[in-house]
């Protein structure tokens, strides 16, 4: 007997095949990732793909729930842009991904979903992902004088500038970062390294203490 969960997964697989057949040059591949439907799309075609997912009768993903950036510094195109969509009509979700580099503009989808406006601004602010034809691509979460993009993997933990209110000047000032103590790196990999070696042998997962990491 087929469970409701199995029926849902099978329905998503059928939907994925439909999307792949309808957009053969715009979709790189369609896959199931942890029982969720995921579409890897061509970057220049992202607006076309989202429009199809919104308007097709079998899809009807009428809500763009979120746009998220992901940073993989070792990749040639270091950024992934992830579009999470919801179909209230079919009670289904789908995830669409494209890749981009620091110098590659991503087409804005604000004409497809107005909610993309602030999502794209946040991705620009936090990652430096540039969205072409965006109506107002300004920083959203950080202040106007902020340097860099805070959620990139290579962004320093301390940032580049310290922002504070100067009581004498009666305004906000920007200064070089001054730490109250030296920056320290804490190593949490080996919680048992201070224990007796005989005791450590019965505790799993401490490869570093044994000199294997």
Curated annotation (Swiss-Prot):
Q: So what does this thing catalyse?
A: a quinone + NADH + 5 H(+)(in) = a quinol + NAD(+) + 4 H(+)(out)
GO molecular function annotation: NADH dehydrogenase (ubiquinone) activity; NADH:ubiquinone reductase (non-electrogenic) activity; quinone binding
The topology of this chain with respect to the membrane is: Peripheral membrane protein
PROSITE patterns xrefs: COMPLEX1_30K (PS00542)
Keyword Disulfide bond among UniProt keywords: no
Where does the record place it? Answer: Cell inner membrane
- Highest taxon of source: Bacteria
Tell me which GO cellular component terms the UniProt record holds: plasma membrane
Q: What EC identifiers does the entry list?
A: 7.1.1.-
Q: Which UniProt keywords apply?
A: Cell inner membrane, Cell membrane, Membrane, NAD, Quinone, Translocase, Transport, Ubiquinone
- SUPFAM superfamilies, alphabetized: Nqo5-like
Q: Carries keyword Translocase?
A: yes
Gene3D superfamilies given in the database record: NADH:ubiquinone oxidoreductase, 30kDa subunit
Q: Which NCBIfam families match?
A: NuoC_fam, PRK06074.1-5
Please report which protein family the annotation says this sequence is part of: Belongs to the complex I 30 kDa subunit family.
- Role: NDH-1 shuttles electrons from NADH, via FMN and iron-sulfur (Fe-S) centers, to quinones in the respiratory chain. The immediate electron acceptor for the enzyme in this species is believed to be ubiquinone. Couples the redox reaction to proton translocation (for every two electrons transferred, four hydrogen ions are translocated across the cytoplasmic membrane), and thus conserves the redox energy in a proton gradient.
Q: How does it assemble?
A: NDH-1 is composed of 14 different subunits. Subunits NuoB, C, D, E, F, and G constitute the peripheral sector of the complex.
Which HAMAP family does the UniProt entry name for this protein? Answer: NDH1_NuoC
Protein name per the record: NADH-quinone oxidoreductase subunit C
Name the gene behind this protein. Answer: nuoC
């Amino acid at each position: 007997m087929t469970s409701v969960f199995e029926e849902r997964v099978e329905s998503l697989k059928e939907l994925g095949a439909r999307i792949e057949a309808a957009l053969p040059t715009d979709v790189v591949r369609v896959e199931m990732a942890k029982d969720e439907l995921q579409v890897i799309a061509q970057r220049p075609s992202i607006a076309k793909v989202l429009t199809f997912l919104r308007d097709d009768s079998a899809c009807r993903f009428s809500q763009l729930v979120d746009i998220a950036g992901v940073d993989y510094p070792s990749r040639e195109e270091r950024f992934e842009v992830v579009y999470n969509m919801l179909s209230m009509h079919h009670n289904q979700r789908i995830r669409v991904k494209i890749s981009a580099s620091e110098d590659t503009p991503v087409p804005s989808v604000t004409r497809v979903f107005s909610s993309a406006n602030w999502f794209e601004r946040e991705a620009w602010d936090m990652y430096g992902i540039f969205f072409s034809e965006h109506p107002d691509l300004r920083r959203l979460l950080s202040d106007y004088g902020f340097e860099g993009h805070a959620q990139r993997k290579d962004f320093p933990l301390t940032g580049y500038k310290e922002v504070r209110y100067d009581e004498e000047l009666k305004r906000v000032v920007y200064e070089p970062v001054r730490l109250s103590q030296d920056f320290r790196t804490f190593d949490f990999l080996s919680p048992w390294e201070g224990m007796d070696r005989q005791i450590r042998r019965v505790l799993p997962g401490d490869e570093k203490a044994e000199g294997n990491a």
